[in-house]
């Protein structure tokens, strides 16, 4: 059976409700924290490390919630939302791989911001390159990622770590 390799906004909303990978498994956050409109490509192969990759997009418009409050008179998408989107996508990759449990961001290595997303932008693109997937007592993915706006790279993150846990009671 061939795995689905692209996901629409409706697919991602289903994932936020726990309907895509099953109850108790990886979910994306619901809007407003869902920072992705579509996944245009997901694969277990390819990427910079040959272990998998994701490409996803967010459509930008001036009415997005964060522009009204960050910052008044100087609207810009918070950089932490781009970082969170990359964690969301690494967690999605684990669910797509069929690994059980709820996703939790576990950290990252170096993060760099060298650009910004303004209300005049059209599209943010996320590129995730899977470095390693651990399967066993701990199910976790490690990835590098980047965020581009209208084709220009503006953030990078190395060593993004996300795990999936069948119980988060002691987390």
Swiss-Prot record:
Compartments where found: Cytoplasm
Keyword Signal: no
Annotated metabolic or biological route of this protein: Lipid metabolism; fatty acid biosynthesis
GO molecular function terms attached to this record: (3R)-hydroxyacyl-[acyl-carrier-protein] dehydratase activity; trans-2-decenoyl-acyl-carrier-protein isomerase activity
One Pfam family here: FabA
GO biological process: unsaturated fatty acid biosynthetic process
Name of the molecule in the record: 3-hydroxydecanoyl-[acyl-carrier-protein] dehydratase
Chief localisation class: cytoplasm
Domain of life according to the entry: Bacteria
Positions of the catalytic residues: 70
Gene name, Swiss-Prot/TrEMBL: fabA
């Amino acid at each position: 059976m061939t795995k689905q390799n692209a996901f629409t906004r409706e697919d991602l909303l289903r994932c936020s409700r726990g309907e895509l990978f099953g109850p108790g498994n990886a979910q994306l956050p619901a809007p407003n924290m869902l920072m992705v409109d579509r996944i245009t490509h997901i694969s277990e192969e390819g990427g910079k490390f040959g272990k998998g990759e994701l490409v996803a997009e967010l459509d930008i418009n001036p009415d997005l919630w964060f522009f009204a409050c960050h910052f008044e008179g100087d609207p810009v998408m918070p950089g932490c939302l781009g970082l969170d989107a990359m964690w969301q996508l690494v967690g999605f990759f684990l669910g797509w791989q069929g690994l059980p449990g709820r996703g939790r961001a576990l950290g990252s290595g170096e993060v760099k911001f060298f650009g910004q997303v303004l209300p005049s932008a059209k599209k943010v693109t996320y590129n995730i390159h899977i470095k390693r997937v651990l399967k066993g007592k701990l199910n976790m993915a490690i990835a590098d990622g980047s965020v581009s706006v209208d084709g220009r790279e503006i953030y990078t993150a190395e060593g993004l770590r996300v795990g999936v846990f069948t119980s988060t009671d002691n987390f």
